[in-house]
Each structure stands twice: as structure tokens, then as C-alpha cells.
Amino acid sequence: MIIDILNSDSDPAGRNIRAAIDELLKNPPEGGFPLFDGNEVTFHTVSGRIIHAEKSAVNPDADLIIVVSRHSSVNPVPVLTVHPAGNFGIAGLGGNDRELGLTSPAWMKSILQNHAEFVPEGYRVSYEITHHGPTDFPVPFFFVEVGSTEKEWNDPAACIAAAKSVLYARPSPEIVPLIGFGGTHYAVRQTAIGLETKGAFGHMMHTRDVGSVSKEMVSQMIAKSCGVFAAHIDRKALSKQEISHIEGILAEVGLEEITEGDLRKMNAMSFSTWVAYRDLAALQAPGLKIFPHGRIFDGDPAVVELPSDLFSAAFLGYEEIFLAELDKMGNIFHTTGKGGRLMPTLLTSAKNRQKVSGDLIVLSVQQITRTQDSLVEGDQITIARRQFDPVLARTLGVPSGPLYGQLVAGKPVTLPDGRMITPDMVTKVVRTSIKIPGLENYS
């Protein structure tokens, strides 16, 4: 792969980042800088502003272009940024109207993560939404910037940090390439996703553009982000009408949405594995949500359905114990339904299904025998529960009201006629039997 690093001689931050790169290259770490691992790196400097640069300014054989540059803002803050180039509307700062540049989610994510590692004290780290030119470079490219005033552009610590972010860039193959909708210029939610999950953004659109975006522009965002899997919508930054508008376009172009919550759940699993489990859950019941425990391995997913009466008897009121046991098991999802209620539907790999099913039944029976008066016989478990019997209470002359409450709470009461009624006198034993085929085979 040929990587061309581009800067402008009229851009102080670009000059200083390039100078920092040159200086760092004099003393590379053992094994060299990751940027050079299997790659050929070339350098070009142009005159004038890079936002107006022509295709002829770069290495014609390059596969990727990294532009090092200054960042300016009407509300200046010390910041290290990375962003794609493009214009969602009229080209006010270089490039062509309504044209986006090719870009690379994987490389931008790696730079963003390096920014977070090398950032000097007092600086923030951020994606920026897609903006300004150029837009017609023939290969993926993006801007690595130091902002936002002359003080930061000439700050050696900031420029060295940006240089290190470039030299130590090593894209991970385990990413989820995305396009993004909503948010402010500094792309707060997208930045958090890029730093804390496998999500890697290509083109990102400011809230102000979402309401009027066309299907053609969304298609361009997808195509020029070079292989995106899904779209992220910052719903808190958009109105209901804007959300509905973009959802409709995504449905038309066939790109699914993924939430920040789902990205955080994915941990080490592949995107295709996540989708397979999510879609299987959707077939079981509308609105079923999935939550992984431990590492989820690739492979065909399968459903494990615990008998609902067994599940309720074992874990109603003991949900945290159940979830902790799933953490120990790993390679399994629990599910929740309406209102976040824990469901007896679990998901695991097809090859693991039989073992998981047996383990969960044993776990349920053990939980019941540990916490309740119960008896296991053959393929049946019988649970005996003592509970207040209002019929017995009425028979003994206990009036409804506060005295009932005291008896239910396990306290004796004295009736107006002087008789004492103890809880045992108004308690009945209710036995519930749950049949579990094959229970006698589980140890």
C-alpha cells in the first residue's frame, strides 16, 4: 500500500506536524513505526490552501492520502481532530458542490485512538463531521488536524502528538465501519463510539443537514466511506421528523441502523455474528433485546428456551444471581422483553446449545432447592410455599384491613374479642409441580 502524507507550506500546523514526523523518523522505535509496516510512505508539500488542492498535488500511485493541517474554529478550543472531506451543500471552502471525498473509516479510527493516547494536557480529541474540500482526490483521504489558533498550531507538544498519531497508525480489521447522522461539528457521540467501541466512522453529517438530505447524498456517503456496514443516528440530536426522514432513506437504500448501545454490547464478536443473533432474537418475539455474556464465538446461533414456570420459580427476585451465572458460562445472550423484563429465552451457538440447555436446567433446579422448600422426584420438581390464606382469616373472624397486613407480615394480632391469631393459624401450604422432561438425566 502506498500512503502519501500531504501538507501545505502556507499552513503552520501542517508544516509543524510534517517537521515533527521528519524528526521522529530519525529515531524510530524498535521494529519501526506501524505506518511503515508493509506500506510505502511518500511525502508531498503544496503551495496555498489544501482545501483547494488539485488531484495533481498528490502521488498518482497513492492508495491513501493523509493530510496534516491546521484546524480553525469560531469557538476555538485546543484540539486534535481527524475528519473526512466533503460538501453536503454549496462548496464554500473548496471542493465541488454536493460532493464528498473518498475516505477510510479504519484509518481515521486508528488516528483518533492514537490522538487519545498521545494528546497533550489541556487538549481534547475529536472526530469532526464531514466538511470542506477537496472532494475529488481519486483515493481515500482524510485530514489530521491541530487546532484551533496560532498558539496551538505552533505548539510543539500538539504537533508532535499529531505526528505520532500518524506514524503509529495501524488499522484494526475488527471494526464496524459506519456513517453517522446528527450531532455538532465536533461529533461528540461519534467520537465516544470511535474511542470506546468497534465503531469506525466514515462520513458524518451535522444535525442541520439531516432534515433535507436526499437519498442520493446518503448513497454517496455510503459509497465514499468505502464499505460501511451500518448507519448510526444520534437520536438525541435530532427531531422526530428528522429521524423519520433519515430512517426512510436508510430503508430505501438498504442500510441498517445500529445503536450506540448495540455497538457497546458487541465486544469482541464480529458484526455478522451480532446481526445473526439479533435477527434470531427478533424471530422469537417483537422487541426482544439481546445482551451478551463473555466472549461470543462465531458460528450459527441457536435458541435455548427455558420452561417459563421453571425460570420464574427459580429466578423471580433473583435476577442478579442468574445474570452472574451467565457471566461465568460465557458465549451466551440473555434477553429482555417489554419494560426490560428478563425473559426465559436465551441464545448461544448451535454447537453449544445442548450443553447450555442442560446447564441452565441444572442451575434453575439448584437455585430452587437452595432457596425454597422443594422436592425433586424423577422428571418433576415440587415446590411448597407457605402463604397467607384470607379464607382462613375470615373463618377465624379476622376483619379485613390493617390486621390482615400484620398477619401477612408474620406478626400475631389480637382480635376485639381478645383472641390472639398467629400467622401459622392463617397460613396454607401451596404445592406447585413443574415437569421437566429428562430431569433425571441431569446431574
Swiss-Prot record:
Molecular-function GO terms, alphabetical: D-aminoacyl-tRNA deacylase activity; zinc ion binding
Keyword Zinc tagged: yes
Co-factor remark: Binds 2 Zn(2+) ions per subunit.
EC number(s) reported in the record: 3.1.1.96
Top EC class of this enzyme: hydrolase
The keyword Hydrolase is annotated on this UniProt entry: yes
One Pfam family cited in the UniProt record for this chain: tRNA_deacylase
Chain ranges passing through the membrane: none
InterPro entries membership: Deacylase_DtdA_archaea (IPR018033), DtdA (IPR007508), RibonucZ/Hydroxyglut_hydro (IPR036866)
Signal peptide positions (record): none
Record field: catalytic activity: a D-aminoacyl-tRNA + H2O = a tRNA + a D-alpha-amino acid + H(+); glycyl-tRNA(Ala) + H2O = tRNA(Ala) + glycine + H(+)
SUPFAM superfamilies cross-referenced by the UniProt entry: AF0625-like, Metallo-hydrolase/oxidoreductase
Cofactor(s), names only, from the UniProt record: Zn(2+)
One Gene Ontology biological process: D-amino acid catabolic process
Swiss-Prot/TrEMBL keywords: Hydrolase, Metal-binding, Zinc
Family matches, as NCBIfam families: PRK14866.1-3
Family: Belongs to the DtdA deacylase family.
Subunit structure: Monomer.
Role according to the record: D-aminoacyl-tRNA deacylase with broad substrate specificity. By recycling D-aminoacyl-tRNA to D-amino acids and free tRNA molecules, this enzyme counteracts the toxicity associated with the formation of D-aminoacyl-tRNA entities in vivo.
Protein name listed in UniProt: D-aminoacyl-tRNA deacylase
Naturally occurring in which organism (per UniProt): Methanocorpusculum labreanum (strain ATCC 43576 / DSM 4855 / Z)
